[in-house]
Each structure stands twice: as C-alpha cells, then as structure tokens.
C-alpha cells in the first residue's frame, strides 16, 4: 500500500493516531509546508522530507484510528502498513517520535485498556523499543492542557515509565507544534543523536 521509500541511510519517523498533529510537527521541524487538515487521516501515504545533500530524512507516517471518508477496514490496513514500515526499516530509523494529543491521550489509552486489549499507542511504543528504535513521546497540544505535570505523569505511567515524568525528559517531550514550541522534542532527539555519536544529525532538530 505504501509507495517506495527514498534511499536514505538515516531516518526519524513520526507515528501516532490520526489528528494528533504529526504533519504540523513535521512543518515545525523542517520549516516547510506539508499537507495538514482538520479531517482525521489526511495523510494516507508516508510523507518524506529529505535534504538533498544529506543522507537523512524525516518521515511522517499516516495516522491510525478514525479516518473520515474511508472504507471499513482501511483504518486497520493503515495501522498494519505503519507497523510493517517501522519493522522493515528499523535499522535505518534513529528515533521513532510517537506523537500524542496531550489533552486526549490518557482518556483514549484508558478507553482501550483492559482484558486482552492493548491500546494502539502503547503497543506502538513497545514495538519501537522491541525493534531497537529509540522512542520519544511528543506530547502535543500542551497549550490546551491545564494540569500539565499531572497529565504528563499519567502519560508516563500508562507507558510503563515510573513518574515523575521529569526524569524521562529524553523520552517524554511536551510540545505545542502549532505554535512552534518544540524545544523539548529537539532536546530529546538530540540527546539520542549524542548517544549514537551522530552530532552531524543535530542540525535537523535545532
């Protein structure tokens, strides 16, 4: 279903549910306009942004969950393709940025928890870890959240990260992409570039 991936050795991917602001975040990181919209699921194919002279790219993968105006079964197919993409290119993916809606994430996770069910976003977080891809959780739309620390602690807890969230600042990054407030994400991603001794990649998140 997904088209061919550009030939780049290193990559950072943006993953998450529909309508959490992945495309807006991609615009904030790259400084270039990318397709965004109010309807859930605007991005249906991976949106790759590469720098012509560099062996690196940033990829916005389609959101999973509710998509307006698509046939039944397509949503699950998108999720399967996202997982397949990450699995297939895990060796190239330096960081997997899991984008959450800070205001809605806890409710969505709790709604899909219980019994044998694992919420998609939690499943995706664990998948990144299992594949050896460093996860960074970009908690977006924080300008709409009143109880900031409590909300971030709850998100950390749902992901199996013992609160307080502040001790996980290399993993949890509160941001507001629409207002270009992404410094916490840049710091988190760059800390992993540091650990990998890839200072050459820090120019893309600064």
UniProtKB/Swiss-Prot annotation:
This is Probable GTP-binding protein EngB. It holds the Pfam family MMR_HSR1. Its cofactor is Mg(2+). GTP binds at residues 16-23, 41-45, 60-63, 140-143, 175-177. One of its GO terms (molecular function) is metal ion binding. It comes from Halobacterium salinarum (strain ATCC 700922 / JCM 11081 / NRC-1). GO terms for biological process: cell division. Mg(2+) binds at residues 23, 43. The keyword Cell membrane does not apply. Necessary for normal cell division and for the maintenance of normal septation. Belongs to the TRAFAC class TrmE-Era-EngA-EngB-Septin-like GTPase superfamily. EngB GTPase family.
């Amino acid at each position: 279903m997904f088209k061919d991936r550009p030939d780049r050795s290193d990559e950072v991917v943006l993953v998450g549910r529909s309508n959490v602001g992945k495309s807006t975040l991609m615009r904030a990181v790259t400084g270039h306009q990318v397709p965004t919209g109010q309807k859930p699921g605007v991005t249906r194919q991976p949106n790759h942004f590469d720098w012509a002279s560099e062996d690196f790219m940033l990829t916005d993968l389609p959101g999973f969950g509710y998509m307006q105006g698509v046939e039944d079964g397509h949503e699950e197919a998108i999720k399967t393709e996202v997982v397949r993409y990450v699995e297939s290119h895990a060796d190239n993916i330096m960081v997997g940025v899991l984008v959450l809606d800070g205001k809605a994430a806890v409710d969505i996770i709790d709604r899909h928890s219980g019994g044998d069910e694992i919420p998609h976003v939690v499943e995706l977080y664990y998948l990144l870890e299992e594949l050896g891809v460093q996860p960074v959780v970009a908690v977006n739309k924080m300008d709409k959240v009143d109880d900031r620390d409590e909300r971030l602690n709850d998100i950390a807890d749902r992901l199996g990260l013992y609160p307080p969230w502040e001790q996980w600042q290399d993993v949890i990054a509160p941001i507001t992409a629409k207002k270009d407030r992404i410094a916490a994400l840049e710091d988190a991603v760059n800390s992993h570039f540091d650990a990998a001794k890839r200072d050459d990649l820090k120019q893309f998140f600064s």
